[in-house]
Design a protein with these regions (language model features):
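HIT superfamily nucleotide-processing domains
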Residues: 1-121
Length: 121
């Protein structure tokens, strides 16, 4: 299968891993919308949210809470948005959840992904 997210969770493509368990890997988004923008990616290839089981989705949400709260604390965010794209808005056809920290200042800083990663890993 030629899925970039499958290659990332299998270690074929390097990523900035924030968290991993038997079912998911959380990585920094390489094209972040805000500082700390991260992705929760199931290790099993699931095309979109219509295919994910209730159990798998519950685990994704559990991880979203764990990692999201950590990111918020470490980066000083005052809120967090969880987002799942579907259909034409889903760029990669492998289910994933975006974690987008929300700050009082809405603009992305000039800090690099590497700098942000070092703060929240």
């Amino acid at each position: 299968m030629d899925c970039i997210f499958c290659k990332i969770v299998n270690g074929e493509i390097p990523s900035k891993k924030l968290y991993e368990d038997d079912n998911v890997r959380v990585i920094m988004d390489v094209y972040p919308k805000v500082d700390g923008h991260s992705l929760i990616i199931p290790k099993k290839h699931i095309t979109d949210f219509t295919e994910i089981s209730d159990e798998e989705l519950a685990n994704v949400n559990k991880v979203a809470k764990l990692v999201g709260l950590s990111i918020m604390k470490k980066l000083g965010a005052n809120a967090l948005t969880k987002a799942v794209n579907y259909g034409d808005s889903q760029a990669v056809k492998h289910f994933h959840m975006h974690l987008l920290p929300d700050y009082t200042i809405k603009e992305k800083s000039d800090r690099s992904i590497d700098e942000i990663y070092e703060i929240i890993k």
